[in-house]
Amino acid sequence: MTNGNQNTRFSWFIPIDGDGARAGTVRAERPPDFDYLRQVVQTAEDLDYYSLLIPTRFANGLFAEDAPLAETWTTATALAAVTKRIRFLIAVRPGFVALGLFAQMAAALHQISKGRIDINIVPGGIQNDFERVGEFTDQSTRYERAEEFIAACRKLW
């Protein structure tokens, strides 16, 4: 059987919450320490994956809330420094980080990765993540804010 679409790109996921050997794992069997995450990223790059999705969270969303969690931007920047080809799709939740700081972090990651970043705007997501940081806006308000965020980013870049 031949692949009819040679332009298909495959992506993977950086498990900033930790990881298990199979779906449905109750407790992280592999914590999200840098050595493990680097192994995941380098394996994906060796297998010619196109990109890696990195979520943005303020507490562990897969396992216990107090379980270890790797911070998105620091982790992505460190992993970009040890890879050559694979891209990083960073999930951004407008309102979690001030726009000016986001622009600086994205510019730094763009420079370190030599342009291998993409941005995934996530105005919805897990309500508890927003409430955890004192954000009680409804989803429609967050979608409006996402539109403003994107417009401001376009002006900055």
Descriptions of predicted regions:
Residues 1-82:
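N-terminal beta1-alpha1-beta2 module of alpha/beta enzyme domains
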Residues 83-90:
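Conserved catalytic cysteine-centered active-site region
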Residues 62-69, 92-99, 139:
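Short gly/ser-rich anion-binding loops that grip negatively charged ligand groups
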Residues 8-30, 35, 95-157:
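Flexible, glycine-rich active-site loops centered on histidine and acidic residues
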Residues 52, 88, 117-119:
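Hydrophobic residues within beta-strands of alpha/beta enzymes
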Residues 48, 84, 113-115:
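Active-site-proximal glycine-rich helix-loop-beta segment
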Residues 55, 91-92:
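Short His-Asn-centered micro-motif
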